Every structure is written in structure tokens, then in C-alpha cells.
Amino acid sequence: MAEFIALIPAAGSGSRMGEDIPKQYRPLASKPMIYHALRTLCSAERIGMVCVVLAPDDTEWARHDWSEFAGKIRVFGCGGATRAESVTNGLKALRAENHVQDQDWILVHDAARPGLSRALVERLLDQLAQDEIGGLLAVPLADTLKRADDTGRVMCTEPRERLWQAQTPQMFRTKLLLEALEKAPTGITDDASAVEALGFSPKLVTGDAYNFKVTYPQDLKLAELILQERTATQN
């Protein structure tokens, strides 16, 4: 029976946040940002392991207490220069230690999406566990899209019908995901794009607006409010 394994690539620098520490360690609701994704993924009973891929020279991870996840996480210091490289290296490390089989499902999640909920994880597992290809969380695009010219003026308005904004986790079987990433064209920004490049069509599973990616400093306040509301509801 196929297992479910989550993988968080956490080797980025987060330069757009303007911080002197990597974004995934930026304090958020009194914890490092990555903590919130770890907590959600580790709480999902069907996920057997959560793999964290750090930069080889990471010095921040050891400064924090991760003991509450000790029975479920596996940490590798094999992150690469890009997200795709980090995921690829993490998969190879899992294989080398016999933690994963070709038909196991890998859920790749961004460390900078602290708003992921347990309900979204369960929805993803429910809808993709029997799928032939796999897929990803995503939300239908709500905003109007404008295409700009080189001077910053509007060239045209793009139709938004059938357009979705990709989120994570993105869930594919080990063998397919590794092959896709190894053959992926330069510049891909997510795992689904690599799978698409092989000619497959991943399934879109409806996510929600809370599962946004923290990219700029102004995103932090919204993420903080979401986490505070969730904590209050749970209590």
C-alpha cells in the first residue's frame, strides 16, 4: 500500500522579505514560520513522515526546539540553489535511506505557507489518493489580469475563465515526480509544472485564500491574524 510522505523544501534565503535570517525562520505567532506548516502536516494521521530539506550551511534550524515533531520528521541538509533542486535532492536522500518507494505519494509544501489547514490536507489526500497522476491545491483566480508592455502600460486584459492560482501541497508519486524534476526545463517554479512538461495533466483540488504564500513583509500581519484566529477557534 502506498504511503504518504510530506516534503518541505526549506533552503531558500527569502531575500524579498528584507530580513537577515531566511524567511522560513522569521518569527510568526511566536514560532518560526516553518513551524506552522510542520505542525499541520505532522498532525495528519495518514502522513507517515515529514521530510525537511535545509541548505547545507543552515545554522538556524538547530537554534529551535522541534522535539514535538521528533517521531515524524526527517531532516536533510541537501538543499540546492533552486526549489526544484531541493525537492530532487530530498527525494534522492529519502530513497538512499529506503524511506520511500516509487509508488509512494509525496506532498511537497512551501515552508512559507503557514496558513495550510488540516482540512485542506485531508481534502487533498481524499481526492488524489486514487488518482492516476496526482495534483495540487489551487484556487480559482478572482482578480482581473492585465498584461503590461515594456513601459508599464496595459497591453490587454486577459480572460480569467479557467485560470487557477497554484498553491501547495502538490502531490505526486515518487517515481513520476523525480523523473519530472530531473527532466524539467529551466525556470520552473513548482512541481506541477515539471509534471506538465512530461505531458501529464495534474488535478486541481480547491484550496482556500488562507493558504497563501508569505512573500513580502506586509504579508506577515495577515498570516499572523489567520493563525491567531485558528488558535482561538481550536481553544
Swiss-Prot record:
The record marks R160, K213 as: Positions MEP for the nucleophilic attack. Disulfide bonds: none annotated. The keyword Transferase applies. Its EC number is 2.7.7.60. Keywords: Isoprene biosynthesis, Nucleotidyltransferase, Transferase. SUPFAM superfamilies: Nucleotide-diphospho-sugar transferases. One of its GO terms (biological process) is isopentenyl diphosphate biosynthetic process, methylerythritol 4-phosphate pathway. One of its GO terms (molecular function) is 2-C-methyl-D-erythritol 4-phosphate cytidylyltransferase activity. CDD domains: CDP-ME_synthetase (cd02516). The record marks R16, K23 as: Transition state stabilizer. It catalyses: 2-C-methyl-D-erythritol 4-phosphate + CTP + H(+) = 4-CDP-2-C-methyl-D-erythritol + diphosphate. Coiled coil: none annotated. Pathway: Isoprenoid biosynthesis; isopentenyl diphosphate biosynthesis via DXP pathway; isopentenyl diphosphate from 1-deoxy-D-xylulose 5-phosphate: step 2/6. Belongs to the IspD/TarI cytidylyltransferase family. IspD subfamily. NCBIfam families: ispD. Catalyzes the formation of 4-diphosphocytidyl-2-C-methyl-D-erythritol from CTP and 2-C-methyl-D-erythritol 4-phosphate (MEP). This is 2-C-methyl-D-erythritol 4-phosphate cytidylyltransferase. The gene is ispD.
